[in-house]
Amino acid sequence: MVIILLVIFTLLTFITWINIDKAALRITTGTISLLLLLATAILMAFNFNNHYGMEKVTKTTTHEIYSAGGSKMPAGMLMAQALGSKSDNYVLVYADKEDGKAKPHFTPDQKHIIEAVKKSATYKVADVDKATVTTKTTRWEWRNDFFKLLFAVGGEGHSLAKQTSVVTVPKDTWVVMTPAQAKQVQKQQAAAATDPAAAQAQQAQMQAGVQAKVQAFMQDNPNASAQEVKDYTAKATATLMADAMKTMLK
């Protein structure tokens, strides 16, 4: 609509100043049409530069994510690759489903670089039970139908203003590492596997540690159900494995 008004007021300005013979009428109508033209141009500029007629609407979503190491590994793993040396912005590797394949998330889209610079992703380690990703998306939306009718020309409505994603992982049962560190851990695990005696001793140590934790839990919680004991056993196993992986990274 604003483009149509701009064309109309431009034509009116031209016609009134050129084709009207009476000076008083020409000046009056010409001035009015010129002012309307300027007002329309200013409104258009305000909308383009300052999103006049629009407001920011924020939507937040949270869902569970799963280990990049697969569901068979007790400890969870998140791979994080920093984008640049100083920015708190990462490409994060994890699985969207429990039995799903791990894949990179939040990789900048080089084909849509303007939108890409408005997006960021980071992670934090917290005292939580499950790993989640929370995405906060802020978009420019029309204040009402009038502004939409007036300015909606190039699909400005629903345009992205900012998007931030935060992956939160449990501090005890998950490990965050870079892709290079993940390869380092894999090499160490492969080297340990070539020594059956060492591998068996490590496994026995792990089992003993889990058993000790479970026994302590049952002593502190004598009325715990079988499911609660099972859940705690899984958590204790994940915690000890995560500790072992963190030790490998030191």
What is each PLM-predicted segment?
Residues 24-33:
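Membrane-interfacial entry segments at the cytosolic side of transmembrane helices
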